[in-house]
Amino acid sequence: QQDYGTGWFDF
């Protein structure tokens, strides 16, 4: 799931 708030990915 990509975290579009930070640009990183939530694992």
Swiss-Prot record:
The keyword Secreted applies. Keywords: Amidation, Amphibian defense peptide, Hypotensive agent, Pyrrolidone carboxylic acid, Secreted, Sulfation. Isoform 3.2Y4 differs from isoform 3.2 in not being sulfated. The modification Pyrrolidone carboxylic acid is found at residue 1. The keyword Secreted applies. One of its GO terms (cellular component) is extracellular region. Expressed by the skin dorsal glands. One of its GO terms (biological process) is defense response. The modification Sulfotyrosine is found at residue 4. The modification Phenylalanine amide is found at residue 11. It is found in: Secreted. Belongs to the gastrin/cholecystokinin family. Hypotensive neuropeptide. This is Caerulein-3.2/3.2Y4. It comes from Ranoidea citropa.
